[in-house]
A protein has these predicted regions:
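Extracellular, luminal, or virion-exposed ectodomains of exported proteins
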Residues: 1-21, 26-31, 37, 121-154, ...
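Long, compositionally biased low-complexity segments enriched in polar/charged residues
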Residues: 10-12, 17-19, 156-161, 165, ...
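Long, charge-dense tracts
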Residues: 11-112
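Active-site catalytic motif of lipid deacylating hydrolases and related acyltransferases
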Residues: 77-151, 155-247, 286-289, 294, ...
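Short, surface-exposed basic-aromatic patches at helix termini and helix-loop junctions that form
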Residues: 192, 242-243, 264-274, 294-301
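Gly/Ala-rich beta-loop-alpha elbow adjacent to hydrolase catalytic centers
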Residues: 252-256
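Hydrolases whose catalytic domains are alpha/beta-hydrolase-1, hotdog thioesterase
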Residues: 259-263
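Short, flexible loop segments at boundaries between secondary-structure elements
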Residues: 273-297
Length: 386
């Protein structure tokens, strides 16, 4: 029996898989599997998606008797010469540090795998995960923002810190084609637009990484007919927030709306309510009727779901919310400003939060897009939006 006088990092308890009929405690190689109390407490605090990642890695370790290809030491020294705790196995964005001998496998620690979190030189190498982002300046995007103000928005939100749970009052899910550095400031801008009076000084970003345009589009389709890994991960985060009684104000942009919609549907399928949670969706690629139905069923409060520029093809056409001939014509003429990378971001009808047609027209004129501004002015009276 373990002595309670030992620190939690050295107290061992049997490790059990939390589902009926599946135990890691002893396998055919005859080794018992233990975990330190400290590591077990860390494990219990993870959300369900993270736990499954850990148990999947543990299953592989146990099946190999602790001496498989997942063992770091096996590549550099014989088994008999292995030091006690040099074995590390990856479980998603987590690392497991474990020890092994002829009788036991011991999970010594679980923690973030710092080599796979954070910005990467190649955006497609980034992983989905949570980051706490802090405000660096008081610059906020409004109808009065000048071109100079807009240029400073990229510095308004600063360093991102990888975390394993949402502990801030606000959280966000970014859209497609965003690397982590872009997502951290852009979703801060959308957060301000959605919850202006809160004047948030920090928020948690659930980073939806980009794998390239084609793969991102495939992921959007996947969440409309099935469920992507990112949506499943977000569903576990929502459940974790609810379990810990944390009322979070969410904001989602573009593909983030599709992911959030599907995640809530997955939560609904489990019979779990999300009372206390709030969401605002900006320029979402999701079908609004489907999202509204899912949110109502979950008890989720919708703060805003209609912040869409009528010239933006993402919510109107890709989201299937307005397939009228006039909508198709409007979106067609402005599509190049959505997908083009050389245009100032304030000229895009999609990137920044939609504030008003007058604001959009002003930015088009200031940046020399006179033809587009005239087209928008012609449509303005018919649309009835100022």
């Amino acid at each position: 029996m373990q002595e309670r006088t030992l620190p939690p990092s050295h107290q061992l308890i049997p490790l059990e898989y939390p589902q009926t009929g599946w135990s890691l405690r002893r396998k055919r190689h005859g080794k018992q599997v233990f975990i330190t109390r400290e590591a077990n407490q860390f494990l219990l605090n993870l959300n369900d998606y993270q736990k499954n990642e850990v148990y999947r890695a543990l299953s592989k370790i146990v099946a190999e008797g602790g001496y498989g290809l997942t063992s770091g030491g096996l590549k550099t020294r014989p088994m008999a010469m292995r030091s006690k705790t040099d074995a590390i196995a990856a479980a998603g964005i987590l690392n497991l540090v474990y020890s092994v001998n002829s009788e036991k496998i011991v999970v010594n620690a679980i923690g973030l795998n710092k080599s796979v979190v954070g910005p990467m030189p190649v955006a497609s190498k980034e992983r989905a995960g949570l980051y706490e982002v802090t405000r660096e300046s008081n610059v906020r995007y409004s109808k009065q923002s000048s071109s100079a103000d807009i240029q400073t928005l990229t510095k308004a939100w600063g360093h991102q810190r990888p975390v394993l749970e949402v502990s801030t009052a606000h959280a966000a899910v970014n859209g497609m084609q965003n690397d982590l550095l872009k997502a951290r400031w852009l979703m801060g801008v959308h957060l301000d637009a959605a919850y202006w009076n809160d004047a948030a000084d920090k928020y948690t970003l659930f980073h939806n990484p980009t794998a390239g345009f084609v793969q991102d589009v495939f992921e959007c389709i996947q969440d409309k007919v099935g469920a992507s890994k990112v949506a499943k991960q977000l569903a576990a985060i929502l459940i974790d927030c609810q379990r810990k009684k944390r009322a979070i104000k969410w904001v989602c942009h573009s593909q983030g709306g599709i992911i959030f919609n599907r995640a809530v549907e997955l939560v609904n399928d489990m019979g779990i309510r999300l009372e206390g949670q709030k969401v605002a969706i900006h320029a979402g690629g999701n079908k609004k009727e489907r999202a509204t139905e899912a949110f109502e069923r979950a008890g989720l409060e919708v703060v805003d779901i209609d912040r869409d520029n009528p010239f933006d093809f993402v919510p109107n056409l890709a989201g299937g919310n307005n397939w009228s001939w006039s909508s198709i014509r409007r979106c067609y003429h402005f599509a190049k400003l959505v997908v083009g990378k050389q245009n100032p971001m304030q000229t895009s009808p999609h990137t920044l939060p939609f504030l008003s047609l007058e604001t959009s027209i002003r930015h088009l004129q200031l940046n020399g897009y006179d033809d587009e501004a005239k087209r928008m002015i012609r449509e303005q009276s018919r649309l009835g939006k100022c």
